[in-house]
Amino acid sequence: MGLLREGINEVIATTCRNAAPMGIIYRNGVARMVVFRGSHTAERIREHGWVVANFLYDPVVYVKTAFEDLPPEDFIDEQVGEIAVQRLSGVEAWAAYQAEIDQETNEALIVTLTLLKETICSLALHPVNRGFNSIIDATVHATRFQQSRDPHLHGLIRHHASLIRKCGGARELEALELLSTYLDFGDEE
């Protein structure tokens, strides 16, 4: 699997007309996802049996897809063998997977992914940017904070916001501003 690296790979996962940030766990040559029950992603994996990993480096898209639906024009139809899938426009690469539910818990589905096709659309070098990485972490914490209102998660979000302000560029700062609107934190440090 050329596009995935060992560990957790943060992507925007698309299912049928749905997009959400997702971590693909890649260990010992096996790709898996943990998908929370009740999510659109879980429902569509159960119904259709596929998922597309979209590789892009736009922090605003990660924040937006965590909290809202994208318009239909943001999706591109692709035919992968006998399966019609949707990916996002403007991605640098994408990979379509068969998604098989291996295990179910009260909270999540454990899904094994089998690569069907991967495509590199453009090659771009992305130096490590702590601001971008912190947007990913803050967004993960924010989705959990919305459910639990855990003060510890609020503290983590504030910590990452500080790093974004220090290390991020204009697009990371825009993503942080958008994230703040979803959480109603205002401009607090």
Segments (PLM) and residue ranges:
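N-terminal structural module
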Residues: 1-54, 60
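A residue-level detector for short acidic-glycine micro-motifs
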Residues: 24-26, 55, 99-103, 117
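Short, structured beta-strand-loop surface elements
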Residues: 38-86
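Short, conserved beta-strand edge motifs with alternating hydrophobic and charged residues
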Residues: 52-57, 95-96, 112
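Short coil-to-beta-strand transition motifs
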Residues: 87-95
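Flexible glycine-rich active-site/ligand-binding loops centered on an Asp-His dyad
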Residues: 102-154
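Eukaryotic intrinsically disordered, low-complexity regulatory regions
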Residues: 137-177
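C-terminal non-catalytic accessory extensions
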Residues: 173-189
